[in-house]
């Protein structure tokens, strides 16, 4: 009985037509979003590189939050995860605007995040990238203060790439970055 119900629901969902221009209307940024630099959004490599570049900079340097916002599809989310003080896993979803509102903290202390490895898979108009990163307060810092993995979901609308979500977790005791995600930055080729 349960199996028949699942099959019926799946068949119904698959047979429902998409509303006209659904993907095109979803791909457009919010009305106030700035136009993207074509180089930033021409490829999966380009948009991932732009993500790291736009949030990085020395103490006192303003970030280009208009450029940052231009990378995201309307409705995009950034989703940090981690452990609370009670050691339980936590999750919080924010919009690109909410993330940018925290920009003064990065600008105050200095913040550099760079990709240290990537695996990516593409199917049709979607790409998923596991992008390993390290974070430093200054580009010249010998050791990072944090490392982790950004799980980045991208969408290509036929004219450009968009960030749909960035979902990340930090490396910590008992949660090291697996070696298979290190050493191949910029590897999607899309």
Feature locations, PLM:
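Short beta-strand segments enriched in hydrophobic/aromatic residues
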Residues: 55, 72, 133-135, 167-169
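Bacterial N-terminal signal peptides
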Residues: 4-17
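A short, polar/proline- and glycine-enriched secondary-structure boundary/capping micro-motif
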Residues: 89-92, 140-144, 172-180
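Hydrophobic pocket/interface hotspot
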Residues: 51, 68, 76, 129, ...
